[in-house]
């Protein structure tokens, strides 16, 4: 019997795949557990339209991520941090600080998607990398300034 998997099933396949299994396995386990449905003409057509909609949705997300990447590349963020007279920071600038600076200019990115190559412990200009989508990453340029200075 051919079934369409609704959930990932170990040693059988991933959700959305059409697989052939024995009748008893399908009728007594997969279908009652909600892990699969029978593969009829109607369900196969529904699966195809669902896959097309999902592909369109992913492409829209990818396009918006690329547009956001172009917007971010043109920015130079200002990050305020407490610093001594020699320019050394009290603490470090983290991905969370960069995410807050992006949020202040209207761009919201989760701090876990921002990576710094090395800890930022001095005043100056730096770059971080933000992953906006599975294949869209962007360099975020930011300048660390001492608190109290106006730009």
Curated annotation (Swiss-Prot):
- Example of a GO cellular component annotation carried by this entry: ribonucleoprotein complex
What domain of life does the UniProt record list for this protein's source? Bacteria
UniProt keyword annotations, A-Z: Ribonucleoprotein, Ribosomal protein, RNA-binding, rRNA-binding
| Record-linked Pfam families | Ribosomal_L9_C, Ribosomal_L9_N
What range does the record give for the signal peptide? none
SUPFAM superfamilies documented for this protein: L9 N-domain-like (SSF55658), Ribosomal protein L9 C-domain (SSF55653)
Extract the GO molecular function terms from the UniProt entry: rRNA binding; structural constituent of ribosome
Q: Entry's InterPro entries?
A: Ribosomal_bL9, Ribosomal_bL9/RNase_H1_N, Ribosomal_bL9_bac/chp, Ribosomal_bL9_C, Ribosomal_bL9_C_sf, Ribosomal_bL9_N, Ribosomal_bL9_N_sf
GO BP annotations listed:
translation
Matching HAMAP family, A to Z?
A: Ribosomal_bL9 (MF_00503)
Q: Which family does it belong to?
A: Belongs to the bacterial ribosomal protein bL9 family.
Reported function: Binds to the 23S rRNA.
Per its record, how is this protein called by name? Large ribosomal subunit protein bL9
The organism's taxonomic lineage, starting at the top: Bacteria, Pseudomonadati, Chlorobiota, Chlorobiia, Chlorobiales
